[in-house]
Each structure stands twice: as C-alpha cells, then as structure tokens.
Amino acid sequence: MKTHERAANLALAGLSLAPLVVKVNPNANVILTACLAVYVGCYRSVKPTPPAETMSKEHAMRFPLVGSAMLLSLFLLFKFLSKDLVNTVLTAYFFILGIAALCATLLPSIKRFLPKEWNDNAIVWRAPLFHSLSVEFTRSQVVASIPGFFFCIWYAAKKHWLANNVLGISFCIQGIEMLSLGSFKTGAILLSGLFFYDIFWVFFTPVMVSVAKSFDAPIKLLFPTGDAARPFSMLGLGDIVIPGIFVALALRFDVSRGIKNRYFNSAFLGYTVGLTVTIIVMNWFQAAQPALLYIVPGVIGFVAVHCLWNGEVKPLLEYNESKAEEEEACEEDTDSKQNKKKE
C-alpha cells in the first residue's frame, strides 16, 4: 500500500469517527467521505488482473430497468407489509453481507501483521449433511471477520449511524474494487441510463425518497447534522459506487498505458465537482436531489473534454479490460512456450 493510499484510508477512518467528538459540517462530511471512499476503492481495484466482475453493454442497458423493478418492489413491500417485518428480514440479509464486506475491506491491512501461513494455507469446511457444499477460507479471513461480526451485531441491535456508515463504506469500497465496466463505452451507457433513472424516480415519483427513508439498512450513509428536526443528511451508496467504478476504470486505463493518473484525475475531479453541485442545489432548494443528475455529466464531461483536448478519443474508446486480459494471457503462453523450446 502506497503512502497516499494509506493516508486516504486513515483520513476516511478519522472522518467517520470525527462526528462522535466534534461537530462536523454535514455538507463537507458528505463530499469528503464520498470522495475518499471512491479514492480508496479505485486504488484497491488496480491489480495484476482486472476486477472479478465485468459488466457487458447488454447488462448496462438493462441495469436501470432492473433497478427500477427492485425499487418499485421495495416501495410496494413497505406499503403493503409491516415496515418492521421487512426491515427485520433485510437486517438479517445485510448482517451476512456486512461481515463479508468488512472482512474483505480490512483483510489487506490485517494480513501484514499475521504469520504467512495464516494468509496462504486454506481451510476447507464441508457441510455435515451436504458434503458437496464447502467453504474455503484462511485464518487471516477469520481474524478479519471478527470486527465485521461485532459491527453487524451493533448495527442490528442499535442501528447506530456509525455502524451503518462503517458497513456502508465497506460496501462502497468492495463494489468499486470488485466491479468492472470493462470499457468506457459500457460505462457511458450505464451512467447515461442511471442519469435518467435517478431523475425520474426522484423528481416525478415519491418512490425513491420514500424507500430511502423507510429502508432501515446500510444502503445509505448517514451524516449527523445536529438538528433535531432533521438529524441526518443522507447519501445513497449508488451515488458513490456507480460513478466510482467509472473513475476506477479511468485509473486502470492510465496504469495500462504507463501514464500517471491523467484520466483518473479528470474523472475524480468531475465526481467531486458533481457531488459538490448536488449539495449546493439541495441546500438552495431545500429538497432531495438526484445526485447522478449532477455527478454523471461531471464525470463523463471531464473525461470527454480531457481526451478531446489530448486527441486520444480513439484509444480511450477502444480500451477493453477483457481484451487486455486475453492479450496478457496469450503473451504469457507464448513466453512459456519459448522458454520450453530453449530448455
């Protein structure tokens, strides 16, 4: 982990804890926390191989429709079923997800302090009655899951804003780290679709705001305001993860070309500007705003202007992580065959 990455992790942890001891401006807290989560997730996504999950253009086109169906389903569940019952089921679901997400987030930091065999030697556990079902894990993962277990217990019991945010930030970092858009074309399709999705569900229906207020699970970050009438400002995790995976793609594009953070800086600046404009407009009108309405033009616009200015539209549009992975695999096979012939 590089110095700037370590500094970002420490800053994110400190900012999360700060409202416990001092009054933090909620607007500044929203912007700084979201930007730090994106920054950390982006750098964690830079690995020898591309992220495990890559989105296709077809998936990107369908995503707003699937998201709309899920959002409407949740709205109807809260409307026709007991709110407490729905949230109890969701809490149990997110309890398991929270342990896994926080474990994966903490693991790289914890591994450095544990014996090598704890990191390398896997333990296989098989279900007593169903031997075909097995789980593989290391001792390091067990150690890393302990904080996640206690945070999930705390969240389930108290629904404290800090426990909510720790789990929510973990989901954001893991989402940005593990998901890949594959190409900038796919990213543009996804962000454009969600741009209209966010506008429709926030401005033209009460569904988005109603679900956000009723959904008592770590799908949003909460920022204390000190105002009894409105105790928390909120930011949905989707407003961090969705643009975040586009910013992460820009960073990996820079790394693949051996250049230092040129397009990453543009995308990250676009995200910061877009989120800042969201907060300004929200406070001006004193009403909920679809964050992607401002973030999407910021992220795509800054990257587009940058590549047009540099005359690099073609390499940016042709970049595809899955093809890059295949080319690397072919090169490795060729090298291994040549080495065998020499032997």
Curated annotation (Swiss-Prot):
Topology, Lumenal side: 1-19, 84-89, 163-165, 210-230, 288-290
Instruction: Spell out which residues lie on the membrane's Cytoplasmic side.
Output: 41-62, 111-141, 187-188, 252-266, 312-343
Q: Which residues form the active site?
A: D198, D239
Q: Which residue spans traverse the membrane? A: 20-40, 63-83, 90-110, 142-162, 166-186, 189-209, 231-251, 267-287, 291-311
What Gene Ontology molecular function terms does this protein carry? aspartic endopeptidase activity, intramembrane cleaving
Where it mainly occurs, coarsely classed, is endoplasmic reticulum
Classification via PANTHER family = MINOR HISTOCOMPATIBILITY ANTIGEN H13, SIGNAL PEPTIDE PEPTIDASE
Official protein name in the record? Signal peptide peptidase 2
Q: What gene is this protein a product of?
A: SPP2
